[in-house]
Amino acid sequence: VKRAEALSIPIIVDEAYGDYMPREQSALTLAPNYENLVVLRSFSKAHGLAGIRAGYGFMPKQLTVPLDNITHPYICSSPARLVAQAALEDEGFLQKTRRLTAQCKRPFLERSWRHLTVSHTSPETPILLLTHSDSKVNLKKAFDPFRIKVVSGTAFVGLGANSVRVRVPGEKDQKAVLEAIDQIDLLS
């Protein structure tokens, strides 16, 4: 960030899942020290408000001027703004969301499989990264018969088809997803 600042290059940090992490782990803790840091957040993840298509950003004042030149003040509807404001004021909802997410994620972190590993992420983050030890296994295709939506590792730099990103299921779907993973683990 410091080097980019010396070159007048802004650094943009996407914290779409930022509401799931402890505040001290946010890039926002760095903001007072840098004039080139932009941190973006979304209402679509922890707040569950994907339908309002709204987000927000933290940035130094001087970076708002270029942004004002490429956008307009009505990019977000008035009802969406009211919903977003109410969401920001409801810290209790976020605490409950983080607690429930951790509770639903725990069985996946405590379980061990022969061929599958779960990469370490915060217990409160609602995503899992599964990787099969056999690089020839296409995990996305393996999940297809179970009708479980996953994102192939090929969508991410450094990962292959033997990895998938899985959204942590709610309590009612947990057993079915765990059973599917148990069966997929048998592939080799």
Describe the predicted segments one by one:
Residues 59, 129-135, 147-188:
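Conserved PLP-binding active-site segment of the aspartate aminotransferase-like
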Residues 1-2, 27-31, 64, 85, ...:
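Short amphipathic alpha-helical segments and helix-helix/interface helices
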Residues 102, 113-146, 164, 168-170:
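Conserved PLP-binding catalytic core of the aspartate aminotransferase-like
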Residues 1-11, 15-46:
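Active-site pre-lysine segment of PLP-dependent enzymes
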Residues 8, 35, 116-117, 147:
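Residue-level detector of structured alpha->beta connecting loops
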Residues 86, 107, 111-115, 138-148, ...:
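Generic non-transmembrane alpha-helical segments
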Residues 36-113, 118-120:
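PLP-dependent aminotransferase class I/II
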Residues 51, 124-125, 158-160:
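Short acidic/glycine-enriched loop/turn segments that link adjacent beta-strands
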